[in-house]
């Protein structure tokens, strides 16, 4: 099926009947998958003026394998057209949107490039969005590398809302949130994560999603926890897109002026 951060969030917002216009920005190949994505967005009423189809490179795709008993997933990703997404593909002046969401950092080769001044192109895209009056939001991808600390921090001063899972939070902050079973210990470690990442520059909220629930913290020190909804196992087909679904719901609430308790 179609997927990825931008597509999933747009479609989730469509299903949530978001009372505002949705816009897609990105690159797809001039192939079956690219045509299907653009057509589906159009059918959903999404503005595709900045969703460009380019020749001679395939649409990005991911093969996901999932262990049914544990839910553990392995991703095989081909970057394709996403690898060419660059600063000049974003024109914030023609957009009427309120929030700009960029995902996933660490999967967008040109935007992840570090420039001579030590900043990534993604950081400049986010800065430009802020200058045009947008609220900014980003999501990361889980990978086993040291790139979290070399690529992500320079973008965070231009980010209002940061979404990440427990693995990504661990990699970015250096505080281990993995396989923590004691709720009190998890709360304590999340507080440490928030302190580290806020020092990197996030302006508003950091939101960590985890199988047990969501931890969120505002720069002013407010902290929230929302437990997960426990569904019967037979109702769970898979976890793909779960983080994007959470982000879509939270972004809908932010757009409509809800407090974070209601968003979560």
What are these model-derived regions, one by one?
Residues 1-43, 72, 233-239:
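Glycine-rich phosphate/adenosyl-contacting loop at the front of the ribokinase-like
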Residues 3, 210-211, 241-242:
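A short acidic Gly-Thr/Ser loop motif
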Residues 5-9, 33, 58-61, 244-247:
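Short glycine/serine/threonine-rich phosphate/pyrophosphate-binding segments
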Residues 7-14, 38, 170, 195, ...:
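Predominant activation on well-ordered alpha-helical scaffold segments within soluble catalytic domains
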Residues 13, 165, 243:
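Short, conserved phosphate/pyrophosphate- and ester-handling motifs at nucleotide-, phospho-/glycolipid
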Residues 17, 176, 254:
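Active-site catalytic pocket residues across diverse enzymes, especially alpha/beta-hydrolases
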Residues 27, 38-53, 57, 65-225, ...:
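Ribokinase/PfkB-type carbohydrate-kinase core domain
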Residues 202-205, 230-264:
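Conserved post-catalytic alpha-helical subdomain immediately downstream of the catalytic base
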């Amino acid at each position: 099926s179609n997927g990825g951060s931008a597509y999933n969030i747009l479609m989730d917002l469509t299903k949530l009947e978001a009372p505002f216009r949705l816009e897609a920005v990105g690159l797809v190949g001039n192939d079956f998958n690219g045509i299907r994505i653009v057509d589906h967005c159009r059918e959903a009423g999404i503005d595709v003026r900045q969703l460009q189809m380019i020749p001679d490179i395939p649409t990005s795709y991911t093969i996901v394998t999932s262990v049914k008993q544990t839910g553990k997933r392995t991703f095989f990703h081909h970057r394709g057209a996403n690898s060419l997404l660059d600063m000049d593909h974003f024109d914030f002046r023609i957009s009427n949107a309120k929030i700009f969401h960029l995902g996933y950092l660490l999967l967008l080769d040109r935007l992840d490039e570090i420039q001579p001044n030590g900043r990534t192109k993604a950081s400049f895209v986010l800065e430009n969005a802020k200058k045009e009056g947008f609220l900014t939001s980003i999501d990361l991808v889980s990978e086993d590398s040291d790139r979290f600390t070399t690529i992500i921090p320079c973008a965070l001063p231009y980010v209002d809302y940061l979404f990440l899972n427990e693995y990504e939070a661990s990699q970015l902050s250096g505080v281990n949130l993995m396989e923590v079973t004691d709720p009190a210990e998890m709360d304590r470690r999340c507080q440490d994560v928030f302190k580290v990442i806020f020092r990197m520059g996030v302006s508003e909220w950091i939101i960590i999603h985890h199988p047990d629930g969501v931890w969120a913290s505002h720069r002013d020190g407010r902290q929230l926890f929302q437990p997960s909804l426990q569904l019967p196992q037979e109702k769970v087909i898979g976890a793909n897109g779960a983080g994007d679904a959470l982000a879509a719901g939270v972004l809908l609430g932010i757009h409509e002026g809800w407090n974070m308790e209601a968003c979560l």
